[in-house]
C-alpha cells in the first residue's frame, strides 16, 4: 500500500502557533515610578500583547529582588526598564524606556517588543509569499553586493520549481532588506533570529516562513550563498512526512503580534485555519513523531540540531588518519636459510583425531579388564561348586 502524503507542508506548519514558544517580557519598576505610569504600562500591555507570542510581567523591585534583574545594566531609579527573554529563558535582551518624550512613551516602549518597520513588512509578505528572505546589509559594500546577488539568484532558481511542489504557491519568495543604518532600530528582530543586532561589516541573511518562523541557520558573510539559501527555500515546500527532520519546522519565531486581520488573511491563503484546535492538535502530533522532534512542552531552540542537518539527512564527520602509523621500533629481520629438500614427513594427526583415538583405546582397555574380571569370577564360582 502506498504511503499517504501529509496534508500539510512545512510552510503550512510554520503558520501554526502551538503556544509553547512564548517570549517573556519583564517590565521592571520601583516605588519611584509614578503609579499613573505603572497603570498605563499595564493597560498598554493588555492591548499590545493580547495577540502576541509574548507574555508580559510587571515586576516591582521595591517588593523584592527578581532573579532576572541581575541581567540588567545599571538601572536609573524611577525609570521603567524591560528585559525580553527567549522562549527557553537562556537568552535575554534589554529594552530601555524612551529617553525622548513621545506622546505616549508607555505605548512606544511596549510596542517596540512586538513591532518594528521590518517586522510589519515581513508579516505582510509572509502571508501570501512562499517564503521571505530577511537580508541585513553590512557596512562592507563589496560583501553586501555579493551576498545580495546570491539572494536574488536563489529566488530565481527556486521560483520555476514552485508549481511542482506538493502544494503549489503562486507567490514566489520575496526579500525584506534592513539597511545598515537601520540595524539598531531592528535589534529585537535580529536578536530573536540569531543575527547580529548591531552594524557589522558582513551581510546577514535568513529564510523565514509562515508566522515569522526561521528556516535553517542564519547566514553571515561568505556563507550567504545561493546554494545555502536555495536549500532552505526548497524545504519550505516539502511535505511534512515522518522522514523529514522536524527541526526544519521548529525554527525560532520572532516576537510579533498576530491579530484578526493576519488570521483572516492566512486562512484565505492556506485554505484552512491554522488556529483551529483540531488543526493545531494534528500538527502537534506530526511534529512530535518525527526525527529530531522537540519533546512536548519543551522550548529548546532548534539551532543545535542544524549542526548535523542538511535537507533531511544527517552527516557525521569520520576522522581518517591519512599518514601510516610508525611503529616504536622497527621489526627485527629474520634470516631465512634455504635447506635442501628432504623426504616428505607424514602429516601430523590433528588434535581432534588423536584425542578420539586415545578415547577409543581407553574404552577397549576397560572392556578387556571387565571381561577378565567376569571370567575370573566365573572360575571361582565353578571351583566352589565343585567342592
Which residues does each PLM region occupy?
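Non-globular targeting/processing and membrane-anchoring segments
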Residues: 3-387
